[in-house]
């Protein structure tokens, strides 16, 4: 159960990083 929780947290962090990177590139292009 803990492994699935850590996988979910890792996925959410990765998605947040991708979103921030896209917004940063759009604002600074």
UniProtKB/Swiss-Prot annotation:
Q: Where in the cell is it found?
A: Cell inner membrane
Q: How does it sit in the membrane?
A: Single-pass membrane protein
Q: Which UniProt keywords apply?
A: Cell inner membrane, Cell membrane, Membrane, Transmembrane, Transmembrane helix
Q: Key word Metal-binding present in the record?
A: no
Q: What is its main location?
A: membrane
GO CC terms: plasma membrane
Induction, as annotated:
Expressed during stationary phase (at protein level).
Listed transmembrane segments: 5-25
NCBIfam families recorded: membrane_YldA
* UniProt name for this protein: Protein YldA
């Amino acid at each position: 159960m803990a492994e699935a929780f850590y996988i979910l947290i890792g996925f959410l962090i990765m998605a947040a990083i991708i979103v921030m990177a896209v917004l940063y590139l759009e604002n600074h292009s």
